[in-house]
UniProtKB/Swiss-Prot annotation:
Gene3D superfamilies in UniProt: Coproporphyrinogen III oxidase, aerobic
Oligomer and partners: Homodimer.
Name under which the protein is recorded: Oxygen-dependent coproporphyrinogen-III oxidase
Protein family (similarity comment): Belongs to the aerobic coproporphyrinogen-III oxidase family.
Example GO biological process: heme biosynthetic process
Enzyme Commission (EC) number: 1.3.3.3
Ligand binding (substrate): 181, 197-199, 348-353
InterPro entries: Coprogen_oxidase_aer, Coprogen_oxidase_aer_sf, Coprogen_oxidase_CS
GO molecular function, one term: protein homodimerization activity
Site for Important for dimerization, residues: 264
Record gene name: Coprox
Keyword Oxidoreductase: yes
Residue numbers annotated as active site: 195
Length: 390
């Protein structure tokens, strides 16, 4: 029996509401009371029956055991229309979620595992939340996918119009969104935090026309600067971009530097990476392949850094600095992050889930300023003035 541990909380695109638990015909469960950081929740463990068989369509079997849970869309539908971009994106994000979760679990020294929650949304779709908390390597890690449909509220439509989308003002429009999103907060201050998000969006206009686009990015937030790590991270992302267009990396690197700027502090959240949105060219197939390459570059860009630093010694000073920088992370997410804003605009959104990207612990000190020649000061110079790493 393969036990899947389910925990209610979602790091998502910031748009989705948890409504009810999924109980398949081969599932049984029990409730556990627990708590997670800023949110309280219950955990459910399901043991899937050994008699459960992956569905077949035209003799082809989908091996769902490689995923963290059953797909959101019925497996027969996924196999029956594999050329549908909605289905292709769902399979991709399921794969990315499972591969990344297992790569992180392999770095835990004491065998800590992700808890998994598969949830549904009555308006359409659902998601899979994977949470690893209080590990010896990862203090808090969330890796999540969402596949949802619904109607965009007018405020969200207005936000998209501001980005140049040709949508009718004041309308409530049907949409489809799918994506994988992760924020990893390590325990050791010498291991950086990583965030990535890759998504696909469709919206139907008042005239019945369908608009689609991809978005996403991967960025790194170190607490102590290691230039070799920064170069490795950026070079890995650049290689993924260069497979498709040599102009992508410099464009999306600058976009990332601009987007993750904490304007009221005049500093960056981290050392950047790549960031892009509204990608709908040169065609849907090419855009999907580009997003796939970027998503698959996450593990080789990040896991070697975890392995390199996870067992390094550190003291209270390093820990306090890590908490101060996490305070900056909180400031950005609550004030500037587009996904958080989008979620807060969405009626009925599960706000604990939207805020789950926040770290377990953060710190603010009045007028804190590190010495310029200290290791902390070296990081601040780069955060004040982003640089090229490759």
């Amino acid at each position: 029996m393969n036990a899947l541990r389910h925990t209610i909380s979602l790091v998502s695109l910031g748009t989705f509401q948890l409504v009810r638990r999924t109980r398949g015909p081969h599932a049984r469960g029990f409730l556990l009371g627990t708590g997670l950081g800023l949110a309280s929740f219950s955990a459910v463990t399901y043991a899937h029956s050994a008699e459960a068989v992956d569905p077949k369509v035209n003799g082809v079997q989908m091996n769902t055991s490689r995923f963290m849970a059953e797909p959101i869309t019925d497996s027969k539908a996924l196999l029956g229309d594999k050329e549908n971009m909605r289905h292709r994106m769902e399979i991709l994000i399921m794969e990315i979620q499972a591969e990344f979760c297992r790569a992180l679990e392999a770095e835990e020294n004491c065998g800590q595992k992700f808890k998994v929650d598969r949830w549904e949304r009555p308006e359409g779709g659902g998601g899979i939340t994977c949470v690893l908390q209080d590990g010896d390597v990862f203090e808090k890690a969330g890796v999540n996918i969402s596949v949802v449909t619904g109607s965009l509220p007018p405020a969200a439509v207005q936000q998209m119009r501001a980005r140049g989308k040709n949508l009718k003002e004041g309308a409530s429009l049907p949409f489809f969104a799918s994506g994988v999103s992760a924020v990893i907060h390590p325990r050791n201050p010498h291991v950086p935090t990583i965030h990535f998000n890759y998504r696909y969006f469709e919206v139907e206009t008042a005239k019945g026309e369908k608009q689609w686009w991809f978005g996403g990015g991967t960025d790194l937030t170190p607490y102590y600067l290691c230039e070799k790590d920064a170069s490795h991270f950026h070079q890995t992302l650049k290689s993924a971009c260069d497979e498709h267009d040599p102009t992508y990396y410099p464009r999306f690197k600058k976009w990332c530097d601009d987007y993750f700027r904490i304007k009221h502090r005049n500093e960056s959240r981290g050392i950047g990476g790549i960031f892009f949105d509204d990608i709908d060219s040169p065609n849907q197939e090419a855009a999907f392949n580009f997003v796939s390459s970027c998503a698959r570059a996450v593990i080789p860009s990040y896991v070697p850094l975890v392995r390199k630093h996870k067992n390094r010694e550190y003291g209270n000073n390093e820990r306090q600095w890590q908490l101060l920088r996490r305070g900056r992370y909180v400031e950005f997410n609550l004030i500037y992050d587009r996904g958080t804003k989008f979620g807060l605009y969405t009626p009925g959104a599960r706000y604990e889930s939207i805020l789950m990207s926040l770290p377990l612990h953060a710190r603010w000190e009045y007028m804190h300023e590190p010495k310029s020649q200290s290791e902390e000061g070296k990081l601040m110079k780069v955060l004040k003035n982003p640089k090229d790493w490759v």
